[in-house]
Amino acid sequence: MPSRSPACRPRGRNRRSAADAVARPLALALILVSTLPRAAHSQDLALPPVQPRGVRRTMTCDNIPEPFGTRSRGASRLPGFEVTCGPNREAMLSIGGDAYMIDFVSVSGSYVVVFAEPITQVCYDGKGKPTPDTGTGAKSSEGTTTTFTWSLEGTPFTFSKSNKLVNFGCNRTLMANFFIVPGDSSPLYTSCTTTCNTLQISGSCLGEACCEAPMDQVNGAKAFSLSFERTTANGTGEEDGTCSAAFFLDKDETVFTFSGDEVRPLKTALLPPGERRMVLDWAIGSTSCEQTQSYTFEKLCKYGTCVDAPTGAGYLCKCPSGYDGNPYVSDGCQDINECRNYNSNNCTYQNLCNNTLGGYTCSCPENNIGDGYRTGTGCNTTLATPVSPSQQPQGINVCDHPEKNPCTYIKYCIDLEGVVSCACPEGMSGDGRKNGRGCCFSCQKHFPLDTVLGVSLVLMVTTTTAASCYCWAVKKRELGRKRAELFRKNGGLLLQQRFSTITSQGEDQYSSKIFSAEELKAATDNYSESRILGRGGQGTVYKGILPDQTVVAIKKSKVFDESQVEQFVNEIAILSQIDHPNVVKLLGCCLETQVPLLVYEFISNGTLFQHIHNRNATRPLTWEDCLRIAAETADALAYLHSASSIPIIHRDIKSSNILLDGNFVAKIADFGASRSVPFDQTHITTLIQGTIGYLDPEYFQSSQLTEKSDVYSFGVVLAELLTRQKPISAARPEDSCNLAMHLVVLFNKGRLLQEIEPHILAEAGEDQCYAVAELSVRCLNVKGEERPAMVVVASVLQELRRSFTIDQAVGIKDESIQENSEQEEKHLHESRSIPSLQSSEVSTQCSMEAKMSSFC
């Protein structure tokens, strides 16, 4: 019995009383079991293994039974029964070119349970358009009708009537024909139709978005064809994330992951495709035992007997009567001990059942008469005792002589030619004998030992199960209450209200989803270390896979300020409406955890920081990439500052917060430090937050956050792209460990070229490099009001992109780089025409940056 942990103990007097009510019978059961006679052998207590198909087992290549086999074990002796091994040694069965994981093989029942993909499955995207069919059925179309077929011809398998055909989706009709022989003119037909009134579904499959087509009449079918059509064209059920599917399912399995008392959205209702099991019957060959040559099945069934397959074609090997096991292997058939189980034998007294090889015998207690079998004469409690000739003189009736009479009551004695029977009067029980139990009105009833053991085990299992269920129910209720409290505390009700407002205003295409804690726990494999994408100052980011196979990034923050709940909810609602190609899309959040979780779209190609500073990258960034990434980032920031519904200041712009997708398109991420600015304000006052090296010195001094703080941080990113150096580096001299300050000083001295990455300078040319450097210096101005707006920065970068594209088109190439002294002299002259920072401004910036330079 599992120990009762403190976590599952109910709180309060009433709950403790309920727990005691469960625990007392359990204690009594344990006492009863501990007092049983120790003479009972452990093997007599063993219960036969019960393996319902509804419990997942998954066969491995090491325990797959004959007639199935692998090449490493000499393979199977029969065609079609060979299996292969998966990555984790799971047994895989090949049928028609597809591999199916084997869950269970029944030798005695001649069936195999496999995990099967849907016959057809179509899901819908955010615009209600169907995605490509992911089913395994062979597809063909004629007019408006689409047919899916599947044939098991040439294999030892047939479709089992232990399955059901499931039709899932809105307003769908499923019609299927099963053929005993492919092309049969009299197929077996089954069908069902679904309707839809809402996008919610209960745990039942009775026609509302789900129906089951029975297969009870399908026996021995080798092929089938299926049509799966819409019955209406109203579009219900074609919303983002919903699916329509038709699939086989073991009729012992449930269609859904929840009970019939719950109601859930359609998109989360189905079992995952890899969890659906179907049953296939199997048989050897296609002829009966009589039609098969005797030496063939004598060779295959030499450890058992041949019987015709119940599916109609082929034959099977069975163990002889009284034996059970695997008749396809040597010593596979083992004698059944019928005496262990009351239902396996026919004895009146179970303790007088004697097991024999291939059978058993029954007997009666001493001095009872009968054959001992329940369906025979049984055992008569009226005892028959033969009397020896010495006790019964010739012609004398023993019952007439009290000294010779063995019965308690003389008148209930019967002497039949020397055989004396004793009985008890009506209403009394016993054997009626003087030297036996006699006769009494309330004789103690003696139960056989196995009956006592059985009752004790049942009592113990029942009470243990009851206690476990009660504990589980208490834990589930406590967990639900805690999650509801966290949901309320984290602003869940307020956020639901905001999302409802957005939807009512016709902006639902931008609204996000509120995920449950269980959904995200499953998506991240319980927040496995292997799913971590990165760690930062704000928290940890995990890779998650939702039930519809959408890959997402889930951010788990370190801390959460409960006093800022309303502001957090407002910002979530705002971010959920941001629709810009260069901003990572917020898909939703979870408020049922101690710290809220944010769910973003997954960007696969890492961060700009990794691509800039990884010298061994397989595809280094070109100057064209750098210009485009910078322009895209600037355009996204300009959108956040001015074009979104409420201006948003990111507050932590840096190269590691700029993600790149597979085409190196920039995406701004990590809005954990972001703040929205009311339209009637130019700044907000807040605690200092950001990353050293990117942090605006003016914001650092005044705590006043403005849009120009993002401009400064973006200027540092431009400096990174030019120099390929990190914002803070101990490798540089102490007075220039800050890249921003270092770049400004070099620019004003006309010595910028010595810090620009050589291959960037060669590819971009001096004019482009100086133009970007000038823009970076303007962004790094110590006075925020003199920095350009992000709209201006984005415009300049777009113009530089066009200029670079034109230069490449006409084949203009930069001249060879001259001697460093000539370069410096030339650009010192050019820099006089470029507005530079005054020496006082540089000094001010240096003093501000000096406070942060200690971080070097």
From Swiss-Prot:
Transmembrane segments: 452-470
Outcome (variant: residue 576 to D): No loss of cell signaling activity
GO biological process: cell surface receptor signaling pathway; detection of symbiotic fungus; innate immune response; positive regulation of plant-type hypersensitive response
Effect in UniProt of substituting residue 333 to A: Loss of cell signaling activity
Outcome of mutating residue 691 to A: Loss of cell signaling activity
Effect listed in the UniProt record for changing residue 691 to D: No loss of cell signaling activity
Name of the protein in its database record: Wall-associated receptor kinase 17
Signal peptide annotation: 1-42
E.C. no: 2.7.11.1
Result of altering residue 317 to A: Loss of cell signaling activity
Glycosites: 171, 234, 346, 354, 380
Region (Disordered): 816-844
Top-level taxon: Eukaryota
Lineage of the species this protein comes from: Eukaryota, Viridiplantae, Streptophyta, Embryophyta, Tracheophyta
GO CC annotation terms, alphabetical: external side of plasma membrane; plasma membrane
Active site, UniProt feature: 652
Gene Ontology MF terms in the entry: ATP binding; calcium ion binding; protein serine/threonine kinase activity
InterPro entries: EGF-like_Ca-bd_dom, EGF-like_dom, EGF-type_Asp/Asn_hydroxyl_site, EGF_Ca-bd_CS, Kinase-like_dom_sf, Prot_kinase_dom, Ser/Thr_kinase_AS, WAK-like
Enzyme class: transferase
Protein source organism: Zea mays (Maize)
Keyword Transmembrane: yes
PANTHER family registered for this protein in UniProt: WALL-ASSOCIATED RECEPTOR KINASE 17, WALL-ASSOCIATED RECEPTOR KINASE-LIKE 21
Alphabetically ordered keywords of this record: ATP-binding, Calcium, Cell membrane, Disulfide bond, EGF-like domain, Glycoprotein, Kinase, Membrane, Nucleotide-binding, Receptor, Repeat, Serine/threonine-protein kinase, Signal, Transferase, Transmembrane, Transmembrane helix
Disulfide cysteine pairs (residue numbers): 301-306, 319-333, 339-353, 347-362, 364-379
Keyword field contains Transferase: yes
Family: Belongs to the protein kinase superfamily. Ser/Thr protein kinase family.
Boundaries of every EGF-like domain copy: 297-334, 335-380
Stretches with biased composition (Polar residues): 833-844
